[in-house]
């Protein structure tokens, strides 16, 4: 994700979350000729995030360093309260004009493309020859140039998915 995207995010409101438990709705703005798109996304956090800061976070997350959002306010609440503490589901509106978007959930990609991205970003130890061969095969046959896009829309691995990826 390139830094200018974060400047386009504007905090709309936030919801206080006091239970354990980011929605992307794409809307056409204007007439058919004006296909500018705005999306609403949520970011779960222990803090109110008026303006996201680039470069903060874990570079070993699924898609690397970035500001992770979701289409689901419920999922944002879950992310906000992952350690049995209260948190916030920050809501943002983002104008997609002039931004490049890759959707890993489109028919153009499959689960092995996503697995390539996980293998590239997550840190774990690969032991055994077959595991190393499998990783090499995925890198050779299912690589995706996702780093050149402003927005990556795709799956998010929780620990059970990552266990699958590690086992693979």
What residues fall within each predicted segment?
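Short linear motifs at secondary-structure transitions and domain/linker junctions
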Residues: 41-47, 64-70, 165
């Amino acid at each position: 994700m390139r830094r200018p995207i974060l400047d386009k995010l504007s905090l709309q409101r936030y919801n206080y979350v006091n239970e354990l438990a980011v929605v992307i709705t794409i809307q056409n703005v204007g007439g058919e000729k004006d296909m500018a798109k705005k999306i609403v996304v949520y970011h779960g956090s222990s803090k109110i995030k008026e303006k996201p800061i680039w470069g903060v976070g874990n570079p070993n997350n699924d898609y690397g360093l970035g500001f992770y959002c979701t289409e689901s306010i419920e999922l944002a609440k879950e992310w906000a309260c992952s350690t049995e503490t209260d948190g916030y589901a920050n809501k943002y509106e983002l104008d997609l004009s002039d931004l490049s978007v890759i959707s890993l959930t489109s028919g153009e990609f499959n689960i092995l493309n996503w697995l390539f991205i996980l293998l590239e970003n997550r840190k774990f130890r690969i032991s055994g020859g077959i595991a190393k061969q499998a990783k090499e095969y995925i890198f050779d046959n299912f690589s995706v140039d996702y780093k050149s896009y402003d927005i990556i829309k795709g799956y998010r691995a929780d620990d059970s998915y990552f266990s699958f990826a590690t086992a693979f």
